[in-house]
Design a protein with these regions (language model features):
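Helix N-cap at the beta1-alpha1 junction of Rossmann-like dinucleotide-binding domains, i.e.
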Residues: 10, 34-38, 105
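N-terminal Rossmann NAD(P)H-binding glycine-rich loop of SDR-like oxidoreductase domains
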Residues: 6-9, 13-19
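Conserved Rossmann-fold cofactor-binding substructure of NAD(P)-dependent oxidoreductases
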Residues: 57-70
Length: 379
């Protein structure tokens, strides 16, 4: 099997390369990135005999297709979400499958094209979204009627690496983190759908606090469309409470709340400057380089899913919890590349898996549930 890893020089990309390099079914790997500077030093912790480095402009469909048609079977896309559709279209044109970690709804409209081309595209194959959604599907099967689904997930530095006011460092893209701080959230409270505007996301009324064994108190911020997934699973009609929350060390919301009020996340260019630059662009370029992991620092992830409902006529509560740490020096992020192993096999041209867009969160809980629906206001 020949795998192309887009964004192979990034934090997650290097972890994926190491995992693939140790996998016997993988015969060769393309590490594709716009900047290959330091390839030898950044990949020195694993055997690179099967790896070929290729400089690639991922915004160019022509370059993507040329790379994919060089004997590639499956593409692992670890690029920013802005490039997801471009990558998927190039993969469809080239007849190769794609695994990525972004939400499915941004490329749902490509399903007919992918099916017509006999291509499988599997989004949401990371931790969040990904493993959390698989746990959704597995756990709700234990209930006759599900009332509560709350998901809490986050990646952040271990305590020893918390040396800045945010107590946060970047394991993927800083712009992606910034974008999530102003994203609207949809939840269900007391049986009613609630929309939490992105500019209100860090207000104290929406912030929760949870205790995580071994880590202590963590801050939980509403983020993402929880109703989208209960609709896909066909359980929204019985849900009384659902939400998706990002976990951070305490103080995250207190940091962002005044910055939002002062317009630091605005896209509007600031008048009086010698060039058109917005506060959002400024924060991206200023803070991103300052929030990188140092050589011997580790990241960690925490995931908690809480379920409540009826089973055998009794009210029960289920909790699934996961914690993990990465290796030092950015050699392997805690965000699990192994979560992509099964999707890679499913996307292989020889796999019997169904074609089109196939995400972990797109399977109904059971055939007796109500059919899939299209929620109003889906992002």
């Amino acid at each position: 099997m020949r795998i192309a890893v887009l964004g192979g020089m990034g934090f997650q990309g290097r972890a994926a390369l190491a995992d693939l390099a140790a996998s016997p079914p993988v015969e060769s790997i393309i590490c594709a990135d716009a900047d290959l500077t330091g390839f030898e030093s950044k990949t020195g912790f694993f055997d690179t005999a099967k790896v070929t480095a290729v400089q690639l402009d991922a915004s160019s469909s022509a370059e993507l297709e040329a790379t994919f048609r060089d004997g590639v079977d499956v593409v692992i896309d670890l690029l920013p979400r802005q490039l997801t559709e471009t990558v998927c279209l190039a993969a469809i044109a080239s007849g190769v499958g794609v695994v990525n970690t972004n939400y499915a709804y941004s490329i749902a409209h490509l399903d007919p094209q992918a099916k017509a081309a006999g291509v499988t595209i599997m989004p949401e194959c990371g931790l969040d979204p990904g493993i959390d959604l698989i746990l959704y599907s597995l756990t709700i099967r234990q209930f006759e009627e599900i009332h509560v689904i709350n998901s809490y997930c986050g990646g952040f530095p271990e305590k020893a690496a918390c040396d800045n006011p945010l107590n946060y460092k970047v394991a993927w893209t800083w712009e992606g983190v910034l974008s999530s701080t102003r994203r609207d959230a949809r939840a269900i409270k007391d049986g009613r759908v609630v929309t939490i505007a992105g500019d209100k996301q860090h207000e104290s009324q929406w912030i929760q606090s949870i205790q995580f064994p071994g880590l202590g108190r963590l801050e939980a911020i509403p983020n993402g469309n929880a109703v989208y997934f209960t609709d896909l699973l066909g359980v929204t009609e019985t849900i009384r409470e659902t939400g998706r929350y990002s976990l951070r060390w305490p103080g995250w919301s207190a940091f962002w709340r005044p910055l939002k009020q002062l317009g630091f996340l605005s896209d509007k260019p600031v008048k009086g400057l010698p060039c058109d630059i917005s506060p959002y662009q400024f924060l991206d370029k200023l803070m991103g380089p300052e929030l990188q992991y140092k050589k011997d620092e580790k990241d960690l992830v925490a995931l908690v899913n809480v379920f409540e409902g009826l089973s055998a006529g009794k009210h029960i509560r289920r909790r699934s919890r996961r914690e993990g740490t990465g290796l030092p020096g950015g050699r392997r992020t805690a965000w699990p590349p192994r979560a992509r192993r099964c999707p890679i096999r499913s996307c292989h041209p020889g796999s019997p898996a169904g074609r089109g867009i196939a995400a972990p969160g797109s399977r109904p809980a059971a055939p007796t549930r109500r059919p899939w629906s299209t929620p109003a206001g889906r992002p």
